[in-house]
Amino acid sequence: MTALQHVAVLMGGWSSEREVSLRSGAACAAALERKGYRVTRIDVQRDIATVLQNLKPDVALVMLHGKPGEDGTIQGVLETLGIPYSHSGVLSSSLAMRKDLAKTVMATAGVPVAEGLTLTRAEIAKAHVMAPPYVIKPVADGSSVGVFIVTEDQAHPPQELFRDDWPHGEELLVEKYIAGRELTCAVIKGEASDVIEIVPLLKFYDYEAKYSKGASKHVLPAPVLPFVYQEVRRLTLAAHGALGCRGVSRADFRYDDRIEGTGGLVCLEVNTQPGMTETSLVPELAGYAGVAFDELVQWMVEDASLDR
């Protein structure tokens, strides 16, 4: 890629993660402009195919979180229009977005995942479908949106499940709650990054903790035993490969350090479109490895292709 190329930064959209996407996109667009690229910022709406067809950018930097940018939809549009793009392709994006299906694929590849069930909202709302504590989460949302932790002292599932305006879809994933620490590792330039521990200053690492300054503490490198550290890195690459991810991805883990060896490690999910805001983990991990934010964004553009 040359500095004269025209990059369309795709952001916004209509998912529950719209605001985070706008922040990620704005940060990346500014970085590319500092590098000399011609940049067009696009707040993605339903007419995106027409907008791109008229604009004819050389490459698309996808900074969409949730649908339609993280589930394979926008990737299909870009493939059809012949516009090289960043991050993962159609199949891996749609697969990773469906947490239940992604877990099946990762487990087959030897990546440990949480015990869980995929059920309808009505089934889950009736009564406990497994012994508490357990976690209820949308099968295809990110940023911890719509996540509920059901504890032992709760006699019934969350009453929010009965809402007429429930926004998170009718299929939900119910998983056994995994006690322990939050660890995260990324794949950047084909290699596993260092490992970071997230210590929420709230009750758990929810949307507010992820995107509000001072709402969580990041410890880098994560203070775990060396063999655990390396196992997180190995599993991150294994999950990335099993799902067919490309470009940058991020794997999130729970680690119960009361269990001997690495038996307490569980992969919660792989994010094919990690956040790029001022509080996001991937820029922090890249920076720790000596890759500045602007260089990371430029690499994402240089890595763009139609072979995803």
Swiss-Prot record:
Catalytic activity: 2 D-alanine + ATP = D-alanyl-D-alanine + ADP + phosphate + H(+)
Any single GO BP term: peptidoglycan biosynthetic process
Localization of this protein: Cytoplasm
Coiled-coil regions, chain positions: none
PROSITE patterns registered for this protein in UniProt: ATP_GRASP, DALA_DALA_LIGASE_1, DALA_DALA_LIGASE_2
Gene Ontology terms: cellular component: cytoplasm
Cofactor requirements of the protein: Mg(2+); Mn(2+)
Keywords: ATP-binding, Cell shape, Cell wall biogenesis/degradation, Cytoplasm, Ligase, Magnesium, Manganese, Metal-binding, Nucleotide-binding, Peptidoglycan synthesis
Ribosomal protein keyword on record: no
Function: Cell wall formation.
PANTHER family named among the record's database cross-references: D-ALANINE--D-ALANINE LIGASE, D-ALANINE--D-ALANINE LIGASE B
Name assigned to this protein: D-alanine--D-alanine ligase
Gene: ddl
